[in-house]
Amino acid sequence: MSCYTREQIEAAVKAKGYAWFEGAKDFDVNIVGVRNSDTGNKVTNAFDDCITISYKEGGEWKSHCWPATTDPGKKGVQQYHNAAGVARLVEGQYRGSHTLGLHQGKYEALKQQKPVKVYRDPNRDLTYDENKIAEGVFGINIHKAGADSTYVENWSEGCQVFKKAADFESFMAVCRKAAAIHGKSFTYTLIESADIK
């Protein structure tokens, strides 16, 4: 899936009625994941989505778009750790849902701190079922895979995961600057590629 411009992301977010942050201070970030609509509910095991971040610095808009997954991988679907089934984040805007914190106690990432909605799929058939929704704090973090991972596998059991570690570090550098100005809470928005015109 190709990446998008800030204007495309902003228009799609506003069209959904979600907040778009553009305060007077620098680094009022908009973190938006874009799920690839073309793959439907099939487990592709690929980093075929993207994560974007848009913000102003010195009064000028800046934006970045990186390959990622917003879906669990094949191993995540088949070997999940929650008895209710693997989690797949429901599209929406989750205000203040994440904070700077350690992913699995290992390295700094954006860690879920407030409830989000997830689809739960317990049947391991490599098709995401969307008929059962749960809401809560499930550890749906925003983190990295390997240096440059090819397959999602169990890098995600519902987390939003960057394909490349270097891209994730660039993302986190912006988040740290944002936290120094606006505090450690971050809003995460997930949309579909079909939402982008």
Model-predicted regions and their roles:
Residues 1-153, 167-176, 182-186, 191-195:
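Cell wall/extracellular polymer interaction/catalysis modules
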Residues 156:
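Residues immediately within or flanking Cys/His clusters that coordinate Zn2+
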Residues 162-165:
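Soluble non-cytosolic domains of exported or imported proteins
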